[in-house]
Design a protein with these regions (language model features):
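Short beta-strand-centered interaction patches in the first periplasmic/extracellular domains
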Residues: 86-95, 129-198
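Short beta-strand and beta-hairpin "edge-sheet" elements
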Residues: 20-21, 64-91, 166, 281-312
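Acidic, small/polar-enriched beta strand-loop surface segments
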Residues: 2-10, 163-305, 315-330
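A generic structural motif
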Residues: 38-41, 85-91, 174-176, 265-267, ...
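Extended Gly/Ser/Thr-rich low-complexity repeat segments
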Residues: 50-63, 100-108, 278-283, 323-330
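Assembly/oligomerization scaffold segments
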Residues: 1-97, 189-196
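Amphipathic, non-transmembrane alpha-helical segments in extracytoplasmic/periplasmic proteins
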Residues: 39-40, 75, 91, 104-128, ...
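Short solvent-exposed strand/turn elements
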Residues: 86-102, 305-325
């Protein structure tokens, strides 16, 4: 299985290539979770026929796929039964330091990217590229998880500029916040890499009208999807528009995020570029599911010499919208 390499490193810097001891490996992520995860089933016979593996909790895990490092994290769980010749390991990347640490911050007139860089510096979390938003925000976070702060800061930016953002850790273990793409560089198609496709359609959470009010209760205007309302009935959401602001972009984004949900579950040949947040061009007219999609969740699996992916695709470009903290002065 030479298309990947799994390495364990001790705190002292000793490194072990354990690739040949792996029977099954999965590498997964989601737009709803900042951490990517590794799960590995390792051969650890009880008869001493193989050397013991350095599977101590906290040891560093590195995964390289097709020659490029894709994951840097640590072992967080280890499981072995007395009647089993395997050990199961779970590793999480450095996103767990964002979700597992809480902070107390007040940001006023600050660009989200500057705020994120500052809080990461306080906690020693490496930072790579952070998307520039062109806006400033104000928010108080009294005892809030750092991951929620990051997503909340960029959610506020998205409400102003209409863009979509994703926070994740790259293969070097650095936090990056990227603007989600509007075009696809990857393609999934029959007779190329597509194996199976299942389509799910859902209107159980539909909201197709947004009424914009002032904070005194005066209706400013209503933004709606008339075609959806005619087909399924009207379901209304309320937005409060503050003085000097225009909630039009936020209202339009709400309609897009809460319209008819059509998701696809795809199994395809493995490609390390098929990770959550990226865009793909899906071509499969037989299931009436074709066009530009975004990956909401991904699981990459290596087993029995095979490498394949299971993806959750969405025709809507979603971000992990998060409301955290409170307004300054409250």
């Amino acid at each position: 299985m030479g298309d990947y390499q799994l390495t364990i490193l001790s705190p002292q810097g000793d490194a072990w290539d354990v690739t040949e001891r792996v029977s099954t490996l999965s590498w997964s992520g989601s737009v709803k979770r900042v951490s990517r995860q590794i799960e590995a089933v390792m051969a650890t016979p009880n008869d001493g026929s193989l050397p013991e593996l350095p599977c101590d909790l906290g040891n560093e895990l590195r995964l390289s796929v097709q020659g490029a490092q894709r994951f840097l994290g640590h072992i967080v769980t280890r499981e072995k039964a007395t009647d089993s010749s395997t050990t199961e390991l779970t590793g999480l990347d450095r996103g767990r330091f964002l979700s597992g640490n809480e902070g107390w911050y007040t940001f006023s007139g600050t660009a989200p990217e500057a705020a994120v860089r500052a809080l990461c510096a306080d906690f020693g979390i490496p930072v790579g590229s952070l998307a520039e938003t062109g806006v400033q925000v104000a928010r108080k976070y009294p005892g809030v998880a750092l991951s929620k702060m990051v997503d909340s800061l960029y959610t506020m930016a998205a409400e102003q500029n209409g863009k979509r953002y994703l926070s994740r850790f790259n293969g070097a273990g650095e936090l990056e916040v990227v603007e989600k793409p509007e075009a696809a560089a990857l393609e999934i198609a029959p007779r190329k890499n597509l194996q199976t496709l299942r389509v799910t359609e859902d209107i159980s959470g539909l909201q197709n009208a947004v009424a914009i009010y002032t904070d005194t209760g005066r209706l400013v205007r209503t933004v709606s999807d008339g075609e959806s309302a005619a087909l399924y009935g009207q379901f209304q959401h309320i937005l409060t528009q503050r003085d000097g602001e225009d909630a039009g972009a936020e209202a339009q984004a709400w309609l897009e995020d809460n319209g008819l949900q059509q998701t696809m579950t795809v199994e395809c040949l493995g490609d390390p570029a098929l990770i959550s947040g990226n865009a793909v061009l899906l071509r499969d007219n037989t299931a009436q599911a074709a066009g530009l999609c975004w990956i909401d969740a991904d699981t990459h699996t290596w087993k029995n010499g095979q490498y394949f992916c299971r993806l959750t695709l969405n025709f809507r470009n979603l971000m992990n919208e998060t409301a955290a903290g409170r307004e300054i002065g409250r």
